[in-house]
């Protein structure tokens, strides 16, 4: 049992104002695995005051000092590798291999990328007699989701520290323990008091007062569109800057010159990775009519090899859905797919055989999907693929862009000119050609209803900065 019922404020572990707690459920067992503090407005006020008090000092710290701080964090993060992997496996239900190779590694990559970005980042620029200065925006409120407990927290924290902005972090109450370990890391390496503050709790008790606090100058949020909209509304009252990374319904365009088996394996991975609980999941798979039958044979074979199971069992690739609420939502979407006329090709409702305990869903493929069906337009956040056929490339691009989202897109094939044309044509913030993978120094963010702003590397640092021009500085 993990019991962490204190908040981390101004460099100390302190009692939460309410004295109340929240149970954290292990999704693989459906049992309580720990408790965290249920914070409230009083906790938020203390945390924001601590951050505001240190703001000017941290803003004026040198680039070298902040780089050294990030370097210390990188080293201690590596020292806590096993603790982070264990926490993520327990709270998220991620298989041990996924906790290590995806979650732990992505967090490390972001701290490293922010540290390295400081080697060349230009905080000042001379333009003739004038000076352009980039300086920390002020106290930043960070609200992070449950599906990537280290990735989403690390990329925001690393950028804020690099920029010189103190923060108040509210991690998801469903996966809070990785963030608590990060707090322990920061405490050990000597992050200055007030620069990092952790307030656990729920959205109404912590997220809302954080978004509305007059001393908070920026809100950075990753999560659902409706919640992002509410944060924008609250932040708009005093014109806070807002950075949002929201949902997606990403297209995966398969070209007609592709190696079919390779395409089947690649598209399968993009759907089942992290149990489909990925905002960039390529769940709309667009297949040329000419290779449809060969692809369906290959993708069914690929899905049949995916092992769903308990996170600590050897060979498990896909763990449980995060919660009963989310599991029920995935089941509802599968039912909608059937009821709206899509053909169930693989998987379907219910749990995999032998997995009655835990929120395990069956990896599922729908075929003959119309792009206007619910399962093709709404983010499911589960391992559900929608296969849509197309007759020509223009039609594929039109289908790909016929969505309110624009977070990611994928294309796989052989002809380089066609691959590049498709990549440029998809209306999304990040595109992968032939499973190239996203490096942590590339910008990450979405078009349309997938968000505002960009994160990762130097682009992430920019989000936490204000720009000042000083005319006549060099006269």
Swiss-Prot record:
A Pfam family the protein falls into: Aldedh
Binding positions for NAD(+) per the UniProt entry: 201-207
Gene3D superfamilies recorded: Aldehyde Dehydrogenase, Chain A, domain 1, Aldehyde Dehydrogenase, Chain A, domain 2
Reaction catalyzed: an aldehyde + NAD(+) + H2O = a carboxylate + NADH + 2 H(+)
Domain of life (superkingdom): Bacteria
Disulfide bond annotation, renumbered to this chain: none
Active site: 245, 279
Entry annotated with the keyword Ion transport: no
Name of the protein described by the UniProt record: Putative aldehyde dehydrogenase SERP1729
Organism the protein comes from: Staphylococcus epidermidis (strain ATCC 35984 / DSM 28319 / BCRC 17069 / CCUG 31568 / BM 3577 / RP62A)
